[in-house]
Amino acid sequence: MNWAKMRLAPWLDTRAKFVAGVPRGGSLLDIGSSDGETLRHFFELRPDLRFHSTDLAGMPENYPTGCRFHRGDIEKDRLPWPDASMSAITCMHLVEHLNDLTLLLAEVSRLLMPGGRAYFETPHPKTVDLPRIRDKWEGAFTMNFFDDPTHTKPVPIAMLAEKARAAGLEPVRSGISRNLMFAASHLIYRFARPSRAKFTAQVHWIGWSAYLILRKPG
């Protein structure tokens, strides 16, 4: 789905609602950009923004045109951007892969402009109790938290908020991340054969991901 179609109704998707609120012409840093799918959606929604990204590996050839990419280890390396240079920072499904969040949160605090906001998203702790994906879909989709062998441990939002406060950030809002259209499609796909569309609808229906929005004081 091209997110340009969501410009009139970004509230249908938790991530889109956050990105839609970034000041016009601002700078957005995506930490943990992976294959760039989410970053491309952000660009479709907000082509006016200046995009930056960082990842341990990354696929910068897939990122939006003009996106400045840095390859690095966020548990060990400081990021190359200046202090207070970002209007917004997004971090999608990264914290559950890390052993130590100290440097990540310190860098988010350093890089945000005063009043800037950060959006974190991570699997809800309840995902440890969901059924495992089996058969031909094993390894192709994550339903149970441990379907992804690179996950370390769930990160409850309350714990993430506490660590963020220690880094000088203010929790603003938290909840369940959903795309309401995908969630509604579960009413149809629940009766269908296993497919990526069926699993995607299911995770949005059950509230697979939790989010936290943080603000830098000022």
Language-model segments: residues:
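Short glycine-centered segments of the SAM/dcSAM-binding site in methyltransferase folds
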Residues: 27, 115-117
